[in-house]
C-alpha cells in the first residue's frame, strides 16, 4: 500500500488514484534560459524515481512535465546574447535533453511548452475575469484578485494578513491589492508578444502551469510535483487560478523535493556556488551523480560535496563488484529482499531504506558466489532489477569499474599487458608475470584473478 507525503495536508496519505488504476502526474519543469544546474537534476531524478516506482507497482501513469519557454529571464538572456528568445530556448532544450539522457531520466509522456498554449491561457484568464477573480485595469495587464479566493494559502499555510504585513512589495498603482499577481503582461518595447483580448503581451508564469496541466491531464488530477522552492508563491497561485476557474480541486496530492545545498547553503547563482549538470558530469560518472541524487529521501536537502560524491562512487563500486563475473540471468530468489525494498518504496518513496536493502542483497550475493554460483547469479539479476527502479546498475560491471580510465591509462595498453602477463604465467615465467603486475600497479590498475581469467579496474 503506497503512502505519499502530501504537502497540502502536511501528512502521509494512502495513495488512491482518482480513476481506478490510472495516475496523472504533472511536474513543473525547467525555465530554459541557461544550462540545467544540479538542483534541476534533483527534481528530474526525484520524479523519475516516482515514475519508475508507480509503473513498477502496476499503475498506468501519464507523466507530464512542462517547459517554460517564455519568461523575463529568457528575454533578458536572449538580449544579452544578441539572439531571439526562441533560438535560445531551442538550444537550451536540446542541452536539457542531453543532460537527462546522461542521467538516465525517462522521457515524460508529454512535455508541453508554454508558447504552444497561449490560446488556452487567454481562455482561462477570461473565465477568471468573468467570475470576478481577475481584472484588467486598462494598461494591458491582467491581475488575479487574491483576496477573493477563500482558500488562498492552504498549501503553504500562509495567511493573507501576514503576507500583507510582512511582504516587501513594490507599489503598483494598477493593482487593487498589493498581493494581486499578474496573469497577462502588457507588451514592453523590444519584447516578444502575442495578441490578446487585453492587448498585445505575454503570459505570467503562474497561469502557464495552470493551463498546461489542465489541458494535458484534466481539471483535476492525482499528483502535482516540483521543487520545494516552488511551493510559494508558484504552486499556491496555481491552486488559486485553477480552482477559481474550474470550481474543482486542482491536484489531489502535492509532492515537493528538497534542495541541493553546498556547505550548508542553498545552491544559487547569487552565492556563486552554482554547478551545471554538464559541469559535474565532466568530472564524475553520470551514475555516481544519479546515485547521489537518488540515495537521499526526495524531500530531504542534499549536501553536495566531494565527500558525498566519493561516498556515492564507493556505494556503486560495491554493487558492481558484486555483479562482476556473474552471468546476466533472470532475477531469481531473494523474495525477502524484494518485500523489504517494496515496503521502503511504498513508504513515501523511501530510498535510503531501499538502498540499505541493496547492500544486504550484495552481502548475500558475495556469500553465495563461490558455494552456489547459480544462486548468486539469480540474486545478481534481482539486484539489477531493483537497481533499475533507482535508475542504476544497468551497466556492465567492468565498464563502470573502469570508468575514468580514459585520459589516465590507455585501456588498450592495459589489455595488452594483461595478455602478456597471462602468457608469462602460462610459461611459468613468474618473474615476468610479477614485473608486469608491478607495472600495472604503478599505472594505478588493480588486477583481479579468478578461474583462469583476469579482470582489471582503476585503483580508488
Curated annotation (Swiss-Prot):
Residues that bind Zn(2+): 28, 209, 234, 238
Cofactor(s) listed in the protein's UniProt record: Zn(2+)
Cited CDD domains: Anticodon_Ia_Cys, CysRS_core
Motif mapping: 'HIGH' region: 30-40
E.C. no: 6.1.1.16
Keywords: Aminoacyl-tRNA synthetase, ATP-binding, Cytoplasm, Ligase, Metal-binding, Nucleotide-binding, Protein biosynthesis, Zinc
Major location category of this protein: cytoplasm
Cofactor descriptive note: Binds 1 zinc ion per subunit.
Gene3D superfamilies attached to this UniProt entry: Cysteine-tRNA ligase, C-terminal anti-codon recognition domain, HUPs
Catalysis performed (reactions): tRNA(Cys) + L-cysteine + ATP = L-cysteinyl-tRNA(Cys) + AMP + diphosphate
Entry keyword annotation includes Nucleotide-binding: yes
Cleaved signal peptide residues: none
GO cellular component: cytosol
Coiled coil, from the record: none
Residues that coordinate or bind ATP: 269
Chain span(s) of sequence motif 'KMSKS' region: 266-270
Pfam families tied to this protein: CysS_C, DALR_2, tRNA-synt_1e
GO molecular function: ATP binding; cysteine-tRNA ligase activity; zinc ion binding
Cellular compartments annotated: Cytoplasm
Example GO BP: cysteinyl-tRNA aminoacylation
InterPro entries: Cys-tRNA-ligase, Cys-tRNA-synt_Ia_DALR, Cys-tRNA/MSH_ligase, CysS_C, Rossmann-like_a/b/a_fold, tRNA-synt_1_cat_dom, tRNAsynth_Ia_anticodon-bd
NCBIfam families: cysS
Assembly and oligomerization: Monomer.
PANTHER family: CYSTEINE--TRNA LIGASE, CYTOPLASMIC (PTHR10890:SF3), CYSTEINYL-TRNA SYNTHETASE (PTHR10890)
The family this protein is said to belong to: Belongs to the class-I aminoacyl-tRNA synthetase family.
The protein, known as: Cysteine--tRNA ligase
Amino acid at each position: 500500500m503506497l503512502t505519499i507525503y502530501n504537502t497540502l495536508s502536511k501528512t502521509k496519505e494512502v495513495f488512491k488514484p482518482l480513476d481506478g488504476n490510472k495516475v496523472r502526474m504533472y511536474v513543473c519543469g525547467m525555465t530554459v534560459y541557461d544550462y540545467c544546474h544540479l538542483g534541476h537534476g534533483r527534481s528530474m531524478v526525484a520524479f523519475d524515481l516516482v515514475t519508475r516506482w508507480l509503473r513498477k507497482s502496476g499503475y498506468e501513469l501519464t507523466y507530464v512535465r512542462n517547459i517554460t519557454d517564455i519568461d523575463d529571464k529568457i528575454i533578458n538572456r536572449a538580449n544579452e546574447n544578441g539572439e531571439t528568445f526562441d533560438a535560445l530556448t531551442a538550444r537550451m532544450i536540446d542541452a536539457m535533453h542531453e543532460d537527462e539522457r546522461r542521467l538516465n531520466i525517462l522521457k515524460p509522456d508529454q512535455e508541453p511548452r508554454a508558447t504552444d498554449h497561449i490560446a488556452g491561457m487567454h481562455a482561462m484568464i477570461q473565465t477568471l475575469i468573468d467570475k470576478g477573480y481577475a481584472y484588467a485595469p486598462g494598461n494591458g495587464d491582467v491581475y488575479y484578485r487574491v483576496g477573493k479566493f477563500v482558500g488562498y494559502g492552504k498549501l503553504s499555510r500562509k495567511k493573507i494578513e501576514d503576507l500583507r504585513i510582512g511582504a516587501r512589495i513594490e507599489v503598483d498603482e494598477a493593482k487593487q491589492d498589493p498581493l494581486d499577481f499578474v496573469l497577462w503582461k502588457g507588451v514592453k518595447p523590444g519584447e516578444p508578444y502575442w495578441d490578446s483580448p487585453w492587448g498585445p503581451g505575454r503570459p505570467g508564469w503562474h497561469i502557464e502551469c495552470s493551463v498546461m496541466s489542465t489541458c494535458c491531464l484534466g481539471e483535476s488530477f492525482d499528483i502535482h510535483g516540483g521543487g520545494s522552492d516552488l511551493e510559494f508563491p508558484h504552486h499556491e497561485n496555481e491552486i488559486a487560478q485553477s480552482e477559481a476557474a474550474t470550481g474543482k480541486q486542482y491536484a489531489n496530492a502535492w509532492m515537493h523535493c528538497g534542495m541541493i545545498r553546498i556547505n550548508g547553503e542553498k545552491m544559487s547563482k547569487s552565492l556563486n556556488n552554482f554547478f551545471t549538470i554538464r559541469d559535474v558530469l565532466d568530472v564524475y560518472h553520470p551514475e555516481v551523480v544519479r546515485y547521489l541524487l537518488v540515495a537521499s529521501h526526495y524531500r530531504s536537502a542534499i549536501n553536495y560535496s566531494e565527500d558525498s560524491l566519493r561516498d556515492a562512487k564507493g556505494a556503486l563500486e560495491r554493487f558492481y563488484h558484486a555483479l562482476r563475473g556473474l552471468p546476466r540471468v533472470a532475477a531469481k530468489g531473494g523474495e525477502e529482499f524484494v518485500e523489504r525494498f517494496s515496503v521502503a518504496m511504498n513508504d513515501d518513496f523511501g530510498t535510503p531504506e531501499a538502498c540499505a536493502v541493496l547492500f544486504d542483497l550484495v552481502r548475500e550475493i558475495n556469500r553465495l558466489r563461490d558455494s552456489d554460483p547459480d544462486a548468486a547469479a539469480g540474486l545478481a539479476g534481482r539486484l539489477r532489477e531493483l537497481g533499475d527502479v533507482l535508475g542504476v546498475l544497468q551497466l556492465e560491471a567492468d565498464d563502470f569499474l573502469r570508468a575514468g580510465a580514459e585520459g589516465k591509462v590507455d585501456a588498450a595498453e592495459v589489455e595488452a599487458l594483461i595478455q602478456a602477463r597471462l602468457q608469462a604465467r602460462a610459461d611459468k615465467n613468474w618473474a615476468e608475470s610479477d614485473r608486469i603486475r608491478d607495472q600495472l600497479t604503478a599505472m594505478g590498475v588493480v588486477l583481479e584473478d579468478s578461474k583462469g581469467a583476469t579482470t582489471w579496474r582503476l585503483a580508488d
